[in-house]
Amino acid sequence: MSACQTPIIVALDFPTRDAALKLADQLDPKLCRVKVGKELFTSCAAEIVGTLRDKGFEVFLDLKFHDIPNTTAMAVKAAAEMGVWMVNVHCSGGLRMMAACREVLDQRSGPKPLLIGVTVLTSMEREDLAGIGLDIEPQEQVLRLAALAQKAGMDGLVCSALEAQALKSAHPSLQLVTPGIRPAGSAQDDQRRILTPRQALDAGSDYLVIGRPISQAADPAKALADVVAELAL
């Protein structure tokens, strides 16, 4: 497998295997990793992960597990056995849930995926949090959940680029994975708390998840190359 040389993760947000692989075949695994989310995984199951790995890609399995500690830990273990590079769980599942996931990975003798916690979804604003009983700013909730993740031994967090600077300051050892990245001139779509790729890296993000600006581009390979150029890597 060719090691990726950039922080870019391209979201394969498609309903079918054929559509996802059509995009993957236009991308260079040295220039990006790929993210498999709920829609594609539900449609294709574990087979899609193996196929993408065979093409040379490191795979971020973005299923945001959230259940009782044992159930979540067993799901993370299964993901590790697929050979994924990164897997995530919801920090709101609590300290015991995250710690159980850390423990099950630490018991593995083989390669371990990065274990990433999801804080506050980038589509959520203060009024959305108020609607579920949290009368606080998104950044405050992110910092609360980040402290739990650090205590549980997580490798990093999914967070908005707007929270990255504060998180790096508070938890410098955590790797930050940032969705909602939109190259200059792109539409915001349903992501609210966004920055450009360069702004996100400068703010402290370690990995950048980019979807539609690459996946729906007329020339995805060029769109990816343009982002790499924007980052001056």
UniProtKB/Swiss-Prot annotation:
Its EC number is 4.1.1.23. The active site is at K64. Pathway: Pyrimidine metabolism; UMP biosynthesis via de novo pathway; UMP from orotate: step 2/2. It is an enzyme of class 4 (lyase). Substrate binds at residues 13, 35, 62-71, 122, 182, 191, 211-212. One of its GO terms (biological process) is 'de novo' pyrimidine nucleobase biosynthetic process. Pfam families: OMPdecase. Catalyzes the decarboxylation of orotidine 5'-monophosphate (OMP) to uridine 5'-monophosphate (UMP). Belongs to the OMP decarboxylase family. Type 1 subfamily. This is Orotidine 5'-phosphate decarboxylase.
